[in-house]
Structure formats: C-alpha cells, structure tokens
C-alpha cells in the first residue's frame, strides 16, 4: 500500500483507466470480429457497413489514448485491404 497521498490517488486513477481501457479494447475486438465474420460470409454490403463502424471505434480509442494512433491506422488499413480483396 502506498504511503504517499499522491501515489494513493495515482493507484485509484490507474484502476479507473485500466477498467475503461479494458472495456474499450473489448468492444474493439468485438467490432473487428463482427467485420471478419461478415467477410467470411461473403456479405460485402454488411462488411462495408461494419468497416465504417469499426473504423470509428478505432479512431475513438486512439483519441482517448487507449491504443496508439498508428496502431489504429494500421488496423483500419488492414481491414480495408481485406474488404477490397472480397
């Protein structure tokens, strides 16, 4: 346990951020999974719709600092390449 008051606050803050990050990352994984399932099913219209939603979630996560902006860009690029191959 921390002896310093500021460190006690950092522990609380880190826990709140960890829970938020965990939730955001989970929803990202779910969105990407849904997109990939639509690709596997061969449903190009649904996949295109899900790509927009997934890209939005990736951008939001990057702006919140949950993931790095380059990671978001790389994932968006890979997903759009996968859609274009369909």
Curated annotation (Swiss-Prot):
Q: Which PANTHER family does the record match to this protein?
A: 30S RIBOSOMAL PROTEIN S20, SMALL RIBOSOMAL SUBUNIT PROTEIN BS20C
> What species was this sequence derived from?
Mycobacterium sp. (strain KMS)
Look up the domain of life of the source: Bacteria
Q: Where is the composition biased (Basic and acidic residues)?
A: 1-16
* Gene3D superfamilies with a match to the protein in the record: Ribosomal protein S20
Name of this protein: Small ribosomal subunit protein bS20
DNA repair in keyword set? no
Family as reported in the entry's similarity comment: Belongs to the bacterial ribosomal protein bS20 family.
Question: Which key words tag this protein in UniProt?
Answer: Ribonucleoprotein, Ribosomal protein, RNA-binding, rRNA-binding
Using the UniProt annotation, give all residue ranges assigned to the region (Disordered): 1-25
One cellular component term (GO) for this entry is:
cytosol
The molecular function terms in GO held by this entry are: small ribosomal subunit rRNA binding; structural constituent of ribosome
Gene this chain is encoded by: rpsT
Q: Does the keyword Transferase apply?
A: no
Q: Which InterPro entries match?
A: Ribosomal_bS20, Ribosomal_bS20_sf
| Gene Ontology terms describing biological process | translation
Listed Pfam families: Ribosomal_S20p
Q: What does this protein do?
A: Binds directly to 16S ribosomal RNA.
């Amino acid at each position: 346990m921390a002896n310093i008051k500021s460190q006690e606050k950092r522990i609380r803050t880190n826990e709140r951020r960890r829970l938020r990050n965990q939730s955001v990352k989970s929803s990202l994984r779910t969105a990407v999974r849904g997109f990939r399932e639509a690709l596997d099913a061969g449903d190009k219209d649904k996949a295109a719709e899900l790509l927009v939603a997934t890209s939005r979630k990736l951008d939001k996560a990057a702006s919140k600092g949950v993931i790095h902006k380059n990671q978001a860009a790389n994932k968006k690029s890979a997903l759009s390449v996968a859609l274009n191959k369909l």
